């Protein structure tokens, strides 16, 4: 009876610990990818994200990038990701993917966030984002909050 309880306790602890392990290996992969990006690469990722968003049908007409620009950006990022996954972070990729096949997707989400953060470091971008406030009726908003 005691040995059955021990086996059950071990199985439960393994089930509880497995997600933590896969999460930490996913975090390690994400951190490795981010840590191995230099400033130029971060800016290139930001440009790539911008081009990708510019493909949206509602905003495509505002996009000034040429198909050649987009292709060059795609090619650059493809080679960058290949380097990150096969050279800089290959061991972490293997560990993370083995414990959680979704780890690669999660790591790419982090890379996307880094690209967006790069865009948001620009004072011009932050000013442009805040421009809507000139047209918001803050008195009406304040009234709702009181």
Per-segment meaning from a language model:
Residues 1-8:
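Bacterial N-terminal signal peptides that target proteins for export
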Residues 7, 23, 142-146:
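Terminal, compositionally biased segments
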Residues 11-15:
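Repetitive helical segments and hydrophobic/amphipathic motifs
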Residues 17-19:
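N-terminal signal peptide c-region/cleavage motif recognized by signal peptidases
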Residues 22-72:
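N-terminal secretory signal peptides
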Residues 53, 57-63, 67-146:
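Compact alpha-helical subdomains of small soluble proteins
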